[in-house]
């Protein structure tokens, strides 16, 4: 007699839908050169207790549906015994804290990585006066400033998650950098998260170009 298979605690149909959404968008980001050497990780809220997230160590430009797994908001695998990204807690803490957040994107473009190294000492990059600041949800004017935190890199995700949590208590954030690493950005859905990600990429690139122009020759 075969053992009865326990039902999944989430919708398989919804997971399939989100896997296709993630794979298509991640492939475009990989083609842009933002996910080198299997780096980066991506997730989407699945329901009130689970998220769909990329499996660790997979080439982000060649993902298939089996490369998208499910975790609970404690970062534990659900359904299949696969290994999620080492940084899963940085995703799930956002879903746990903000019910409105539906998607979290983490990339490693050269611009993001270089900016994170240059501004690590100050711990923040101030973006001010740019028209594209209106790309961030809730911003309606260029006459404002957005502070992008730069956290020190660490392999201890509990420590980093606690640092992020402490800053979330103090300020509005659409994303942050990790030193020598890359950028996290999020939104209510994939479209908004990508808009925030692309806005950060553009604005950080502008800041790096301004630094070069202002440097004495």
Curated annotation (Swiss-Prot):
Binds 1 zinc ion per subunit. Pathway: Amino-acid biosynthesis; L-methionine biosynthesis via salvage pathway; L-methionine from S-methyl-5-thio-alpha-D-ribose 1-phosphate: step 2/6. It comes from the Bacteria. Its cofactor is Zn(2+). GO terms for molecular function: methylthioribulose 1-phosphate dehydratase activity; zinc ion binding. Zn(2+) binds at residues 106, 108. Pfam families: Aldolase_II (PF00596). Coiled coil: none annotated. Its EC number is 4.2.1.109. This is Methylthioribulose-1-phosphate dehydratase. It comes from Xanthomonas campestris pv. campestris (strain ATCC 33913 / DSM 3586 / NCPPB 528 / LMG 568 / P 25). The gene is mtnB.
């Amino acid at each position: 007699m075969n053992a009865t298979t326990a039902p999944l605690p989430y919708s398989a149909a919804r997971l399939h839908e989100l896997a296709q959404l993630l794979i298509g968008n991640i492939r475009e980001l990989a083609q842009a050169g933002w996910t080198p050497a299997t780096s980066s990780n991506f997730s989407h809220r699945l329901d009130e207790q689970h998220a769909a997230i990329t499996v660790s160590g997979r080439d982000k430009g060649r993902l298939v549906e089996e490369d998208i797994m499910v975790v609970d908001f404690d970062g534990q695998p659900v359904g299949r015994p696969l290994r999620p990204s080492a940084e899963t807690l940085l995703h799930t803490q956002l879903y746990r804290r903000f019910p409105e957040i539906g998607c979290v994107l983490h990339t490693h473009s050269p611009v993001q990585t270089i900016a994170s190294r240059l501004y690590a000492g100050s711990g923040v990059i101030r973006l001010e006066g740019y028209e594209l600041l209106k790309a961030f949800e809730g911003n309606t004017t260029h006459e404002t400033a957005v502070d992008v935190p730069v956290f020190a890199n660490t392999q201890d995700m509990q420590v980093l998650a606690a640092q992020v949590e402490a800053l979330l208590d103090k300020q509005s954030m659409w994303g942050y950098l990790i030193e020598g690493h890359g950028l996290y950005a999020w939104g209510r859905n994939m479209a908004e998260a990508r808009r925030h990600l692309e806005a950060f990429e553009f604005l950080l690139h502008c800041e790096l170009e301004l630094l070069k122009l202002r440097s004495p020759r």
